[in-house]
Amino acid sequence: MAEKYDFQTIEKKWQERWKEADLFRTEETTAKPKFYGLDFFPYPSGAGLSVGHCRNYIPTDVACRYRHMNGCNVLHPTGWDAFGLPAENEAIKQGSHPKKTVPQIIATYKRQMNLIGIGYDWSREINSSEPDYYK
């Protein structure tokens, strides 16, 4: 047995496998039972995820994985509540415009969510500050 658990190598290996298998993408048509898991969409308004974000996302992820492992077709989407005061206030704090800061913050949050290993169907990602969201 190894003296030290190399979590970075092990987690990277499994996350790459999940990505290659497109494990968390919802099947469009299937006879499997359906399950829908939804978290609140985070405000892209800070330097990164907090423990509070994890406290909210991990239980939903556990429920979705459990259903997936038990044969359900799981829809677990995510997105960004990026149109409002939190995003605007963060942009003001940074001396910038939300059109510039929101994509940067979203990229950071998304990278961190992937590091945590949350199983979102990223093909269904939405952003409330995008014009297409309102069509």
Residue ranges and their predicted role:
Residues M1-K135:
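N-terminal, positively charged nucleic-acid-binding surface of large information/translation enzymes
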